[in-house]
Amino acid sequence: MPKRILQGTVVSDKNDKTVVVKVERRFAHPILQKTVRRSKKYKAHDENNQYKVGDVVSIEECAPISKDKRWTVIAAQA
């Protein structure tokens, strides 16, 4: 099974080698058919502490690194 890749915005970089990435998804409400926005925050591994708050990044699923970290940052978007 391929690893999932998500895009999101860095909302916190205060932890060492960790960033918190907010990923937004949009979907049609099943009854109202209105577009609804939902977001979720993922902790991702940032080995060199190079990503800052506001950066748009891609994160990829990986083996568990800690209790909460199961994602790693692979690239920043231009």
Swiss-Prot record:
UniProt subunit comment: Part of the 30S ribosomal subunit.
Signal sequence, renumbered to the chain: none
MF annotations from Gene Ontology: rRNA binding; structural constituent of ribosome
Record-level GO BP terms: translation
Family, as annotated: Belongs to the universal ribosomal protein uS17 family.
Matches recorded under SUPFAM superfamilies: Nucleic acid-binding proteins
Source organism of the structure: Sinorhizobium fredii (strain NBRC 101917 / NGR234)
Protein task: One of the primary rRNA binding proteins, it binds specifically to the 5'-end of 16S ribosomal RNA.
InterPro entries the UniProt entry points to: NA-bd_OB-fold (IPR012340), Ribosomal_uS17 (IPR000266), Ribosomal_uS17_bact/chlr (IPR019984)
Entry keyword set: Ribonucleoprotein, Ribosomal protein, RNA-binding, rRNA-binding
Name listed for the protein in its UniProt record: Small ribosomal subunit protein uS17
